[in-house]
A protein has these predicted regions:
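A short, N-terminal "cap"/entry segment at the start of jelly-roll beta-barrel domains
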Residues: 1-40, 88
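Double-stranded beta-helix
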Residues: 2-6, 106-131
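Conserved short histidine dyad/triad with adjacent acidic residue
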Residues: 38-60
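Conserved hydrophobic/aromatic beta-strand scaffold that supports enzyme active sites
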Residues: 38-40, 49, 65, 87, ...
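Glycine- and acidic-residue-biased ligand/ion/polar-headgroup-sensing regions
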Residues: 42-43, 61-78
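Short beta-strand His + acidic residue motifs that chelate non-heme Fe in jelly-roll/DSBH
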Residues: 49, 75-76, 96-98, 103-109, ...
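Short, surface-exposed beta-strand-loop junctions and turns on beta-sheet-rich folds
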Residues: 55-56, 81-83, 120-122
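Short acidic-glycine-tyrosine-enriched beta hairpin
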Residues: 79-100
């Protein structure tokens, strides 16, 4: 599920967990700076050794991925002008990718655990603005 701003800019992507995956699901459009996929491997699959070559990229802002490992939370997404777009409930196994705009989350169950992955370097005093 893609979440767009009023100006048709991609703000976030949410993937709701499901057990049946045939092979690969690319969660991010190819043109986004943060790429994420879900990949199913069969037994004895071998990913050939490889190196990712140096490629210069320009990043503006921080992109984040949340993977809900347990519990439940409510994620709210905002336009860059701080206008609320929508809220979604995320449960165990769900993934949220934030490309731009604002966000917040509120835990709905005790012991909610997420993995948070973001591009860096993270500059604590300059990287976010609370509203």
């Amino acid at each position: 599920m893609y979440i767009y701003s009023q100006k048709k800019k991609l703000v976030a992507c949410i993937y709701k967990f499901r057990k049946k995956i045939n092979s690969r699901i690319n969660l991010s459009p190819e043109n986004e700076l943060l790429q994420a996929s879900i990949i199913k491997f069969d037994k004895n699959f071998n990913l050939n050794r490889h190196i990712h070559t140096k490629v210069s990229r320009k990043t503006i802002g921080t992109q984040e991925i949340w993977i809900v490992m347990g519990g439940k939370l409510k994620a709210t997404f905002y336009e860059t002008d701080k206008t609320k777009i929508c809220s979604k409930i995320l449960k165990k196994g769900d993934i949220s990718i934030l490309f731009r705009g604002g966000h917040k989350f509120e835990t709905l169950e005790k012991n909610t655990i997420i993995y948070e992955i973001k591009n860096g370097p993270y500059i604590k005093d300059k990287d976010l603005k609370k509203f």
